[in-house]
Amino acid sequence: MRFWTVTGDPVPKGRPRVSVVGGFARMYTPAKTKKWEDRAEKIFRLNPQGDMECGPLKVIVDVYFKRPARLPKKGAAQYNHITRADLDNCIKAVIDAMQNAELMQDDKQVVRITASKWYTSSDDPARVEVSMQSIGSML
C-alpha cells in the first residue's frame, strides 16, 4: 500500500468554468482547484513509491479540515466535518492529481473508494491523507 499526506487546506474539485475568446469557448479549471491539484501532484511525483499502476485500485482518502474555535481542543478529531466542501468533490481533486502524477493510467481503474471528512485535533494542520493499493485482477 502506498501512502501520501498533502498538507494545507483541502480544496474540493471546482466546477469547470467557460470563457469565450475570439468566438471560441474555452473550458478551464478554477484557479484555487488548479493550485491545490498542482501541489498534490508534486507531492505524489516526489514520492511515487513504485511504478504506474495498471490494474484495479482501492483508494482511501481522509480529509482533515482545521478545527473551528467552537469545538473543544481536546477530542475535536472525533467530530465529522459536515459543512463546506462536499466529500465527493474532494475525492475528485485527489484522484485527478494522482492521475496527473502518473500513479495510474486512468481514473477508471479506481474500483473501490473509502473516504471520510474530519476536523483536525488540537493544533494539527489541515491535510489530506491518501493511500492507494492494487487489488489484483477483478476477473
Map each language-model feature to its residues.
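Acidic, proline/glycine-enriched N-terminal capping motif
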Residues: 1-139
